[in-house]
Amino acid sequence: MKNGFLKKALFVLVGFILVSWTKPLPEVFLIGDSIAGHYRPYLEKYISNVARLNWKRDDGQAEKNLDVPTGSNGGDSRMVLEYLKHKMKDQDFKPEYLLLNCGLHDIKHDPETDKIQIPEEDYKRNLEEIVRITGNRNIKLVWVETTWVVDSVHNPKQKLFYRYEKDVIRYNTIADEICRKYGIPSIDLHDFSKKQGIEQFIDHVHYKEPTRALQAAYIAGFLERILNEK
């Protein structure tokens, strides 16, 4: 009886020690546009065995108007930078990885003036500053390219602002150059999403559920490789 109790106690103790020694999963913090908000639930599930996904939180506002960045929608690069500056004041904000995208809101054109929301040089400066402040906190950046725009689909359906694929390509190029400069991994969600076909759009720029799941799986595959390389 006594020996049985001791064996059980020893088993419990060993289990407790093993749990205590288990290294916690790294945290991946996601900031992106409404595209990221749509694939996020799938991504959280797909990487649950290798990382904990956290994200810019929402009060339910982001889904009310996908074209107006509020709540969990990171918005343009200026908004993302300001948000991160605010987060850096919180000493508890220390994810191992920041999974980041901004671009679709940067390239909005005013239909009357044709003025772009964030000019190229400002976009570059904002990304450079994001790299700097996250590096100071030893947060590893993983970049996600901006998804494609089909001018003939987008602009007839969206009268408040226009977007053009030529800007997507140009701004992705700027981001890619910065990624190469600092050795930041970049996930080509642009070409991957384009391969899914024009029929996967539900409106001017957002995707059907099957494509959201595929985007998440594609990103998850890259993240797993990156996490395994550390």
Name every feature range the model reports, one short phrase each.
Residues 19-20, 45, 200, 222:
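Hydrophobic alpha-helical membrane context
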Residues 23-125:
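Conserved SGNH/GDSL esterase-like catalytic core that processes O-acyl groups on lipids
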Residues 1, 16, 205-208:
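Helix-centric, low-specificity signal for extended rod-like, repetitive segments
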Residues 9, 13-26:
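Bacterial Sec-dependent signal peptides at the C-terminal "C-region" and cleavage site
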